[in-house]
Amino acid sequence: ANTILMNCAECEPLLKLHRQLLEKHAYEIMKTFHMVQETVGASEAIIGIKKSYVQTVNALKQHIEEFPGMRIHLLDEVYPMGDEVVLIYEATGRVVRPGGLPIEQGVAVFNVETLYNIYQAVEKKEPVTAKYVSVVAEVNHPVTVKVPLGCTMDDVVAQAGGTTVKDPVYFIGGPMMGRIGKGSDPVTKTTNAILVLPKDHLIVQKKMRTSAIDLKRAASICCQCNTCTDLCPRNNLGHPIDPARFMRAASNQDFRDVNPYINASFCSSCGVCE
């Protein structure tokens, strides 16, 4: 890779884990990022961060001159900026081909927590046995906590003072791309956030719907305005995915042209077209 990229663009609403971690440990993470740059022989190291994260940006600016070859790239507050394919284009102008990998464009992407874990391993000889998790929404004290890997979601929510609704549903991840979980589910290396929501919340109801219901709704509601395709982040990068054509074909069970179905495999599941 000739370019390495740090992803500090929280992809979803309500998530603050990476910006908080980077603000608190700016020097340590930047030092590790520079070490990775030297190790892989990259000529450029870019910190991609949303311009709205003012406190974190200020923390980075205090140390940026200490690391030659590293720069801060300020990003707009739009969704899904944290998608690495979108981030790569915004920060470097390079387009990852449909179904391709960033390394094909000479780019390697690291998230903030991964770099902090590298710092812990290299500088302190500590293995990864814990995870930072944000607990938000219907809890008494929204908080980001460090918890052991393998502990239950109930254990984590308890660190936020418990829930404020009678029948809570644990939504693992962000509101756009997350999934419904159980209180007994373990924290894993990919657990970034727990949203506690009432069971009648729109987001919960949407996740519980079947694809058959979604297709019937699309067939009855779609007015062929093409806005879903106009907003599709992958389509805007030139990828062949076309949500409008796919929904039109699927809702009418039209299989004469299979390309809309094949190209749907390039979907990033961001949910913008919903």
Predicted regions and their residues:
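Hydrophobic alpha-helical scaffolding
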Residues: 50, 104-108, 142-147, 218-223, ...
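Iron-sulfur-cluster electron-transfer modules
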Residues: 1-90, 256-274
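Conserved mixed alpha/beta catalytic, RNA-binding, or beta-rich assembly cores of soluble enzyme
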Residues: 1-4, 8-29, 124-140, 145-164, ...
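Ferredoxin-type iron-sulfur electron-transfer modules in oxidoreductases and energy-metabolism complexes
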Residues: 197-219, 229, 235-274
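Hydrophobic alpha-helical positions that pack around
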Residues: 41-153, 159-166, 174
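Generic secondary-structure signature for well-ordered alpha-helical cores
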Residues: 9-10, 27, 34-42, 62-69, ...
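Generic structural signal for well-ordered, non-membrane alpha-helical segments
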Residues: 22, 26-29, 53, 57, ...
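Residue-level detector of family-conserved "landmark" positions at structurally sensitive sites
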Residues: 47, 167-168, 242, 260
